[in-house]
């Protein structure tokens, strides 16, 4: 399954969010506290304490945005968005190659997301690297844009060499655990929605939406 990159927060929202996070001087802690056993050895960053007021309020904001975005809904079919964390990496910090835990105390990870919160020009290094079969896809998006990718992927964060990288990461438990099934459903839904936008409702389109909905019911969990 190909990752989805998508604008999620507008400029005003992202700059307000960034200011709120950085104004909290007491809640940032060593990222190794939240890593699984395989990841702890390769994790090197700062994370906002999930129990802090700043983290709770702002993770809700991100979850609401993801849940209300039609493209994200169609792509990820989210049942539960969880484990949301704010992370900052300064010079010398990164996150080595790893795979995210399949099950966390907060839910199953079918899809992982990284929402970039500062502009790519403000830091060097810090790209999210997603391993493909023979290559590695490097991703560094403008502030407010999110990438959603299968949690089955090996991935890393390049070491930051200048400035500071600020992101929000989290996981999606999808109604559809299989990447392949989710990809098929996404294509069907995208095609039907495009037909609806172009030609309006029709009995034929009703049949396609019916098949889509019943396929989702059959494959979902
Ligand atoms: Fe990860």
From Swiss-Prot:
Q: Which PROSITE patterns match?
A: FE2OG_OXY
User: InterPro entries in the record, alphabetically?
Assistant: Oxoglu/Fe-dep_dioxygenase_dom (IPR005123), PKHD_hydroxylase (IPR023550), Pro_4_hyd_alph (IPR006620), Pro_4_hyd_alph_FE2OG_OXY (IPR044862)
Record-annotated residues binding Fe cation?
98, 100, 155
Q: Which SMART domains match?
A: P4Hc
| Entry keywords, A to Z | Dioxygenase, Iron, Metal-binding, Oxidoreductase, Vitamin C
One GO process term, biological-process aspect: intracellular iron ion homeostasis
Q: Which GO terms describe its molecular function?
A: 2-oxoglutarate-dependent dioxygenase activity; iron ion binding; L-ascorbic acid binding
Q: Which Pfam families match?
A: 2OG-FeII_Oxy_3
- How many cofactors are bound and how? Binds 1 Fe(2+) ion per subunit.
Q: Which residues bind 2-oxoglutarate?
A: 165
Q: Where is each Fe2OG dioxygenase domain found?
A: 80-174
Name the Gene3D superfamilies for this protein.
q2cbj1_9rhob like domain, Rabenosyn, Rab binding domain
Q: What is its EC number?
A: 1.14.11.-
Q: Which pairs of Cys residues are joined through disulfide bonds in the record?
A: none
Protein name as catalogued: PKHD-type hydroxylase PMT_0286
Q: Which organism is it from?
A: Prochlorococcus marinus (strain MIT 9313)
């Amino acid at each position: 399954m190909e990752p989805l990159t998508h604008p999620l927060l507008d400029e005003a929202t992202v700059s307000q969010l960034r200011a709120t996070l950085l104004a909290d001087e007491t809640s940032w802690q060593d990222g190794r506290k939240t890593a699984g056993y395989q990841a702890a050895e390769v994790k090197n960053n700062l994370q906002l304490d999930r129990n802090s007021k700043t983290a709770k309020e702002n993770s809700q904001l991100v979850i609401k945005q993801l849940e209300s975005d039609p493209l994200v809904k169609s792509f990820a079919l989210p049942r539960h968005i969880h484990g949301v964390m704010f992370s900052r990496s300064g010079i010398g910090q990164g996150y080595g190659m790893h795979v995210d835990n399949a099950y966390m105390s907060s839910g199953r990870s079918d899809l992982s997301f990284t929402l970039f919160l500062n502009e790519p020009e403000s830091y060097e290094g810090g790209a999210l690297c997603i391993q493909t079969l023979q290559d590695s896809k490097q991703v560094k998006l403008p502030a407010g844009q999110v990438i959603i990718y299968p949690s089955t992927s090996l991935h890393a964060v390049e070491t930051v060499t200048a400035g500071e990288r600020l992101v929000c990461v989290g996981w999606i438990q999808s109604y559809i655990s299989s990447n392949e099934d989710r990809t098929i459903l996404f294509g069907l839904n995208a095609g039907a929605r495009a037909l609806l936008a172009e030609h309006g409702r029709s009995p034929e389109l009703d049949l396609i939406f019916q098949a889509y909905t019943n396929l989702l019911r059959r494959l979902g969990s």
